Amino acid sequence: HDRWRSRVRGLPEFGGELPVAAMAEEIDTPGEGQVRALVTSAGNPVLSTPNGRRLDAALRELEFMVSVDIYKNETTRHAHLILPPKTGLEVPHYDLIFHTLAVRNTARFADPLFAGHPDGRTDAEIFRGLTQRMRRRSTKHRQQNIVKRTQQAALLALSPTQQLDVALRRGPAGGWGGRLLRRDGLSVAALRKAPHGVDLGPLEPALPERLY
């Protein structure tokens, strides 16, 4: 908290983020550090944030805006590019939200039901392409040490399903989670054999380990 502050009003960051109420002023207030480009994803801040009229006007002043979205709405209408990702039954699914609200420890994975358009791209593929293009133009990225750049490149090379597989295997129920490798550990391959999901038992306390 409060590791740095917003340019215009000096609002403190929290968790690496600024209050959304600062977005419009950071775009329409001239000076060093003024926001001149914006990337949005599946959102409509013109309607969902305070002082939407000011933000609506500010978005018109951007030099470049790209929206990863399947809808043209009050926000994305200002984008120079709208990149629609595959969605719904065209993409693999692993629930990250409702698993955290469950009363038991469960896991379930589903492959795409439909292939989608041959030219279509997933959110991950779109953001990977944007990231690679931005890094080519970034002096800061080129100045990073080779180890960090290699780590970032390796992460970008993994698909979301591959990243999920690594996370499952490294988790407490995964084959890499204990001291010994286990063939029966949780993985994407194991979940594919259980299309209705797996029940790993009651929840277990984990907060102390997450804190220390």
Spans of model-derived segments:
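Long, low-complexity segments enriched in small/aliphatic residues
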Residues: 1-12, 153-212
